[in-house]
Structures are given as structure tokens and as C-alpha cells.
Amino acid sequence: MRVSDFSFDLPEALIARYPKAERTASRLMTLNGNSGAITDGVFTDIVAQLNSGDLLVFNNTRVIPARMFGQKASGGKIEVLVERVIDQNTALAHIRASKSPKVGNELFLGNEDSDVKVKATMVARHGALFELKFNSDESVLTILDKIGHMPLPPYIDRPDEDSDKERYQTVYNEKPGAVAAPTAGLHFDEALLERIKAKGVELAFVTLHVGAGTFQPVKVDEIADHIMHAEYVEVSDEVVAQIAKTKAAGGRVVAVGTTSVRSLESAAKAALDKNKPLSAFYGDTDIFITPGCQFQIIDALVTNFHLSESTLLMLVSAFSGYDHIMSAYQHAISQEYRFFSYGDAMFLTKQELIKQDTP
């Protein structure tokens, strides 16, 4: 398949630049992966979509304030986006500058209106990423909490605000490390989670630290030629046991967000590659899910609306069928659903592989 097969035109007005006042106030489109039937509703309808005995799997990563501004020793302005924290004093980062820093160059980071300035040294380059060593007694995460900005996606196209520190974060976040939110989870508040649990639905938590690569455009013509960026994943023994218990009792595994899908399916792929049953998985994944892929664990999916020609649009097309997804997106545009990170959501059921449709 070609990347252009996943293209659609989106009116600018449908890009959500701010969240709804209430987390649960978004709309919810339900798509049946087998029939293609679409139902329009509100996000709290998800309670009715879930059954007692289902397992709802969330990504508990915490978004770090990964964007920093500053200058080089020469005075040139720079923008730094931390991609991954390596240790207490070291991070890999993307750097925007008129001229890229060289090994040994010092960077001075901090807001113009603040007295807090931190010095970092560029110690190595790894492809598009720069390895920075922070010259401070404080950890990288502490430094980011002091001078960092929430790394809003480029399509939100506005400076971050104080409200984003709460709203570009799930209510159940636990493990810091992401530079983008697992956005399907933004629709849940504590009250909705309690309603879901009261129905007999069990909750499980995996970790995938979302990297900035999630926003990188696919730069090849054929999707088979695309190389995915790697992200760190944790799927615990406890989650593996919850999945086994759910499947044995006839329940469904429902992933909240494509990051939860990629976490669980990465663990399943690792087990399959070893010809062993599902087990805990800790490590990097570069899994790329496209139409024709067979899902080992996931039965249903909660997800936001994704960018044209993105790997995430390819993933949901693999899950619910290419034709069904592309038709659903046209329906969403005609009904003026809000798109992307702060936008509305979908509840998708899986299309059986024998009915998989690809162009």
C-alpha cells in the first residue's frame, strides 16, 4: 500500500487547539469493524460499550515538560525538545537552531523572563538526536519541571499555557517519560473510571513513553519502506495475568489508545518470535502495524482521530478495516468532529482478518 492511500483533507477549523471544558464532554463515534456501521454519541457512552468482564488497558506514562528554550554560547537562539532521559544528567534531544551545535558546544537553557538558567554540553550526536549532558546537581527531570514547557504537538499551533500542565496529561499518569500524551486517555476523569469499574470492568496499566517521532511525517511512498522510531515499553507480569484471566472468561481486551495497542502487541510479537506464551515485556519497540497485520490480544480500541498519512491512521485501518476507517473519517469531517490530541474519540471493534479490505 502507498502512503497516499491514507490521505484525507481536513478543514483547519476541525483541529482542536484547546480541550473541552470537561474531559468527558467530547463526542464519541462508534465504528463496527465488521459491518462498518457508525453511531454518533458522546464520550460517556463508552460505559454502555463496555461489558462486565472486559479489561480496559491504559498507558500510565506521564508527559514531561520536555521543551526548553535558550541560546548557544554564540548567542544564537535554540529550542530543545527532550526525546528520552538517559540518566540523571543526560538526555537525547531534538534541537532547532539556525546552525546545529557541535560536540563540545555549551547551551544555556531557561526562559528569558526567569533567573533560572541551566548549562548543558552537547557530547555526542546520534542521527537526528543530540546527546546533552546537564551541568547541574539536579536531575534532568527536576530541571525540566523548573524550566521546561509542555510539548504540545505542532498542529495545536499556539504557545503552551498553565492549563496544559493538567489537561495534556491523563488523570492516571504515573511514570514520567513521554514527550506526547497518550491522548485517548485524556477523555477519562475519576468519576467515569469509577462508573466503568462499577460495571464490572477491570482496569490494567502498561507504560509506553511516547516519543516525538509520533509526529514525524512518513517520508516514503510505500508504507513497507517506512522505518518506525523506537519507544520504551513496559508490560508487567500483572497485566499478562489480567489478560489471561479476561480471555479465559470470555471477556474482551479493550485498549485505550494506540500506545496501549502497540505495547500489548509488542509483547505478543516478542512471545510469538520465541514460540512461547505471552510474558512480561520491558524494552524498546518499533512495531509498525499496517493493514493485513493480525492482532493477537486487542478486541476493541478507544482512540482519537489521527493525522492524514500517519502511522496511527494505518494502525486503526489495520484494526477496523481500511475502507471502514476512511469512510468513518469522511463522516467525522461532515459531522464536524474535532480532530487530533485535544479532539473527539472513536470506539472501534476489530474487523476479522478474513474480511480485511485493502486497496
From Swiss-Prot:
Cross-referenced InterPro entries: QueA, QueA_dom1, QueA_dom2, QueA_sf
EC numbers, comma separated: 2.4.99.17
GO molecular function: S-adenosylmethionine:tRNA ribosyltransferase-isomerase activity
Cellular component, GO, one term: cytoplasm
GO annotation, biological process: queuosine biosynthetic process; tRNA wobble guanine modification
Chief place of localization: cytoplasm
Subcellular location: Cytoplasm
UniProt keyword terms in alphabetical order: Cytoplasm, Queuosine biosynthesis, S-adenosyl-L-methionine, Transferase
Protein's pathway: tRNA modification; tRNA-queuosine biosynthesis
Catalytic activity: 7-aminomethyl-7-carbaguanosine(34) in tRNA + S-adenosyl-L-methionine = epoxyqueuosine(34) in tRNA + adenine + L-methionine + 2 H(+)
Entry annotated with the keyword Electron transport: no
The keyword Transferase appears for this protein: yes
Subunit (UniProt): Monomer.
Family: Belongs to the QueA family.
Function of the molecule: Transfers and isomerizes the ribose moiety from AdoMet to the 7-aminomethyl group of 7-deazaguanine (preQ1-tRNA) to give epoxyqueuosine (oQ-tRNA).
Stated name of the protein: S-adenosylmethionine:tRNA ribosyltransferase-isomerase
Lineage: Bacteria, Pseudomonadati, Pseudomonadota, Gammaproteobacteria, Alteromonadales
Gene that this sequence comes from: queA
